[in-house]
Amino acid sequence: MAGYKADDEYDYLFKLVLIGDSGVGKSNLLSRFTRNEFNLESKSTIGVEFATKSLNIDGKVIKAQIWDTAGQERYRAITSAYYRGAVGALLVYDVTRSTTFETAGRWLKELRDHTDPNIVVMLIGNKSDLRHLVTVSTEDGKAFAEKESLYFMETSALEATNVENAFSEVLTQIYRIVSKRAVEAGDRPSTSVVPSQGQTINVNEDSSVLNRYRCCSN
């Protein structure tokens, strides 16, 4: 799945959100995916920021608009605007901090409260490079993903392990849902899901795609 550099030309624009506790590595996952950068001194995100990257999927240029916000409670006031229009999410926890995994259910509930319940969600166990410090096993991550019908990967933003794969898988699944619905409807779907367009892509009519647990950690 190749990257695509002409950022102003695309066939589809999908909004993704990064969620999870502060300090789990959301910002570094974003910078690794969009700019291939990692910052050891990365501080907690203040407010909201987003970045974009385009990929070529099945011959179509898919532009991802990925939003990142701090996980700290005092920023919860931005919740509604943050989630609005999102068709995919990466729910991130730190494999070395079990408390960040324990809050995953709360983050998932909040996500589903503000979006379609069948939004494409990838559960991410980040910082897999810190193998000697792991407190959340791969099996625990898989079990939670299976229970909640999520996709699952373990990543390392530091070592760039599975970062591209995780984002690409989410975008691919969204595109497949949109494409299938377009074929069934006999027309071409809207290319944009940006909130200002007043349009969202409703994925609940093809929930069977999401209700199959898929482990992507290999």
Curated annotation (Swiss-Prot):
Q: Where does GTP bind?
A: 20-27, 68-72, 126-129
- Tell me the superkingdom of the source: Eukaryota
Which PROSITE patterns does this chain map to?
Answer: RAB (PS51419)
This protein's major location comes to membrane
Q: How does it sit in the membrane?
A: Lipid-anchor
The listed location of motif Effector region is 42-50
Gene3D superfamilies annotated for this entry? Answer: P-loop containing nucleotide triphosphate hydrolases (3.40.50.300)
Q: Extract the PANTHER family matched here.
A: DRAB11-RELATED
**Listed name of the protein:** Ras-related protein Rab11E
Source organism per entry reads: Lotus japonicus
Q: Which gene encodes it?
A: RAB11E
